């Protein structure tokens, strides 16, 4: 099935023949729906920490920062901004020249409010010999948009979100990436005054990110009295997945070559595994606000990090107690209670185990990576969110699931999905080392049965694409997971350019 040229390509990517066989088998058998027992809620698995109870967690985080620990902000930033400008691309190709719909009118009515206005105005003067007001007065709206999106101007249609100017300040404007530098200084500064930030970027944009970091880091170091250590990585070619045709055979392009596609954000578990850190914050690049709105974000980042290190301290004490061999029956009961009630890890079979077997079970469940995930109350339709799911070993635990992982044709499961009270804003803090200070090998904790298949096309032919288990979904399936309610004001993603006009981005 594979020829010499194919094998060369596999070797170059670092993909084995066995992986190809496994991936093709996934197309044949598909992925099973996950068995869920309920959507997580405030009554079941989501912690609510009222204002008067936040201080101990914030203090716990501050105490942890004072130790000699490595804290890293991990920011997935490879996404292209092209989808942000979908409406403007449609305007460019429309058979009318002036704004017609509400989106187009809003964009032009409030164009001066965008942080990129001055840069766009300069591009228009250079390329059209007229400024934006003059072009609008002449009805040349499309000239303004093409200077925003195309390479002759700001080229925003081809750049990643991290490099776009998001927010205006009295003397300057900041990109989304710069907002990450500012935010990091506010809650992730270690005892030596260092802030470590790791961006995952696409190979074609890495140099642009590095240039921006080189140009701007000094300003933020001075402003926040910190030292930054900024690093970058790209998705590994070994995480690309093979495309299949409709008969589940390897898809070949018109030149007869195998077609590989990026495996989605789940591939980043490899990048996260390469980060040497005790605690890692994970948040998407576009979920940022200007300094005037950062207070709530910073408070809740410290709160969820405080929950993480407080729980980790207890887990480590229990694991050290187990290793000592000096524990009583009461202490075994205490540990199983902690596992079931605090970590929401339950297995009915544990009632049948003797203490010696129970200890092995407790140790295996406690000695895993730990994450605390912010969850926001649903305001719109239910989407990806927190559930209680059944794991392969029969244990029920907290998981973040996408709708595609749930059998919505089953009325019972559909009802659970629709009763979801919270959604996943991608706001995680993770502990990556065990009680002996050794790094967990994160790929060991991925549930490979949680990928999914999507349908795409290439050269006018349909193909099947394989998405790896999502980074915060199946890629972290076998972690200990805690959900904490965080306020909606901590969730301000920029999905369209006009989102930048919302109050929290002004």
Residue ranges and their predicted role:
Residues 410-411, 433:
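Long insertion/accessory domains within large nucleic-acid-processing enzymes
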């Amino acid at each position: 099935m594979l020829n010499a040229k194919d094998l060369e390509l596999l070797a170059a990517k670092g993909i084995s023949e066995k992986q190809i066989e496994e991936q093709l088998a996934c197309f044949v058998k598909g992925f099973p729906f996950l068995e869920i027992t309920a959507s997580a809620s405030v009554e079941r698995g989501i912690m609510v920490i009222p204002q008067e109870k936040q201080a101990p967690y914030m203090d716990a985080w501050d105490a942890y920062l004072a130790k000699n620990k490595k804290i890293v902000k991990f920011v997935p930033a490879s996404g292209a901004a092209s989808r942000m400008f979908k409406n403007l691309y449609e305007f460019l190709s429309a058979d009318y020249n002036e704004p017609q719909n509400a989106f187009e009118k809003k964009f032009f009515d409030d164009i001066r409010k965008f942080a990129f206005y001055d840069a766009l105005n300069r591009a228009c003067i250079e390329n059209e010999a007229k400024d934006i007001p003059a072009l609008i007065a002449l009805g040349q709206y499309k000239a303004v948009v093409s200077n925003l999106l195309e390479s002759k101007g700001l080229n925003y249609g081809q750049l990643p979100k991290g490099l776009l100017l998001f927010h205006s300040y009295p003397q300057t404007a900041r990109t989304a990436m710069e907002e990450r530098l500012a935010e990091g200084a506010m809650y992730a500064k270690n005892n030596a005054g260092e802030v470590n930030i790791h961006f995952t970027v696409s190979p074609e944009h890495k140099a642009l990110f590095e240039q921006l970091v080189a140009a701007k880091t000094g300003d933020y170091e001075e402003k926040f009295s910190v030292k930054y250590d900024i690093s970058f990585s790209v998705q590994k070619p070994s995480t690309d997945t093979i495309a299949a045709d409709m008969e589940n055979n390897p898809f070949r392009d018109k030149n007869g070559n195998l077609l590989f596609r990026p495996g989605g954000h789940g591939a980043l578990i490899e990048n996260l595994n390469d980060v040497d850190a005790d605690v890692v914050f994970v948040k998407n690049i576009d979920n940022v606000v200007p300094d005037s709105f950062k207070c709530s974000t910073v408070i809740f980042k410290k709160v969820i990090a405080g929950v993480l290190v407080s729980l980790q301290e207890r887990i480590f004490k229990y694991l050290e107690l187990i290793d000592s061999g000096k524990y009583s029956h009461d202490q075994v009961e205490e540990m199983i209670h902690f596992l079931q009630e605090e970590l929401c890890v339950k297995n009915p079979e544990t009632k049948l185990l003797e203490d010696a077997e129970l200890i092995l079970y407790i140790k295996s469940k406690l000695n895993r990576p730990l994450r605390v995930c912010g969850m926001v109350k649903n305001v719109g339709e239910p989407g990806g969110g927190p559930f209680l799911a059944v794991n392969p070993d029969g244990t029920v635990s907290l998981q973040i699931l996408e709708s595609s992982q749930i059998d919505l044709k089953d009325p019972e499961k559909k009802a659970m999905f629709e009763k979801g009270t919270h959604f996943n804003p991608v706001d995680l803090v993770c502990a990556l080392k065990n009680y002996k200070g050794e790094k967990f090998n994160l790929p060991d904790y991925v549930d490979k049965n949680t990928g999914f298949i999507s349908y795409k096309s290439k050269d006018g032919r349909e193909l099947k694409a394989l998405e790896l288990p999502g980074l915060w979904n199946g890629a972290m399936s076998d972690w200990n997971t805690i959900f904490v309610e965080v306020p909606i004001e901590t969730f301000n993603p920029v999905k369209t350019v006009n989102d930048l006009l919302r109050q929290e981005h002004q």
